[in-house]
UniProtKB/Swiss-Prot annotation:
The keyword rRNA-binding does not apply. Residues 143-154 have a biased composition (Low complexity). Keywords: Host cytoplasm, Host Golgi apparatus, Host nucleus, Phosphoprotein, Virion, Virion tegument. Signal peptide: none annotated. Tegument protein that plays different roles during the time course of infection. Participates in both the accumulation of viral mRNAs and viral protein translation at late time of infection. Modulates the RNase activity of the virion host shutoff protein UL41 probably to ensure necessary levels of key cellular mRNAs and proteins. Plays a role in microtubule reorganization that occurs after viral infection by stabilizing microtubule network. A motif (Nuclear localization signal) lies at residues 160-163. A motif (Nuclear export signal) lies at residues 233-245. Coiled coil: none annotated. Its main location: virion. Residues 280-289 have a biased composition (Basic residues). Interacts with gE (via C-terminus); this interaction is necessary for the recruitment of VP22 to the Golgi and its packaging into virions. Interacts with gM (via C-terminus). Interacts with VP16; this interaction allows the formation of a tripartite complex composed of VP16, VP22 and UL41/VHS. Interacts with the capsid-binding protein UL16. Interacts with host CGAS. This is Tegument protein VP22. Residues 23-68, 112-184, 262-304 are annotated as: Disordered.
Amino acid sequence: MSDTWRRRRSGCNDANATEELVYSTVRSDHRQRRPSRGTFVMRENDLYDKQSVSKENDLYESASPNDDKVYTRRGMSTAAHYRDSEHIYETCEGDEFYDACEYSLIGGGKLSTSNGRQSPAKAQPPPRGAAAAPPPRVPTRPPTRAAATSTTPRQQDCAPKQRASPGVNSIKSGKGLAFSGTPKTPKSQWYGATHLFNKNVFCAAVSRVAAAHASDAASALWDLNPPKTNEDLDRFLKAAAIRILVCEGAQLLEVANSTMESTPDGYAAAGPNGYDRRPRTASRRRSLKCKPPADDFFDDTNSG
């Protein structure tokens, strides 16, 4: 036997009859036609009490062709016991058995009505367009240090070095200061970086000369009345005021270079005995002609 679902109509001759699926265990090769209503009598199996269904006309030739009665006769083999779970179902003429829609209640496999055996469910083939994923690659050896360093993100490149202003490198080199040699003629206009180069050289020369003058003024001021206690030092610092006036004129670069030769840093030389005043050179005597303001705290114009 095979458990199947079969379609059944609610009415045989009604055009508006509805269809429903009826669960049965009927085999398709045991159907008997009723001559009166044009229906089939379905038996569940061929061992149903070993009784066969036949038409009355087959047994008695005098019977009416419209006789609806069904007679049974004993079979030749041993009778089987009747089972309450077995039933007979009627289907209208023209009904079809949908083998493609018959599924077992367990496992979802398709049933065959010919022999009552259950066919295994077919596996769905993979789609043609989908490519099979490659198996995961298993490393045969641990990664080396070079591979580990290659996986790390590269550090950002160092920012480009900022270009130095024109003339700054020559000033830091410690060489003598000199203005730009271009243009050659005195009345020609400056162009390019000439203006910025000459400006940087001028500022460096003034800075060196002013540093030398400040060192000389500070040394002279300290020698006038050197403090001897912390209280004297505080009073001295409050009263000290040194003003530097740079007026070398055209000799600015010469004075700056001479200062650079005596003190490479542009300041007064600091010997083992402390600060020593620079000797009075011709350029220094010319710079002393530029007198500071009258209210200046320290004036060394008359100092010998």
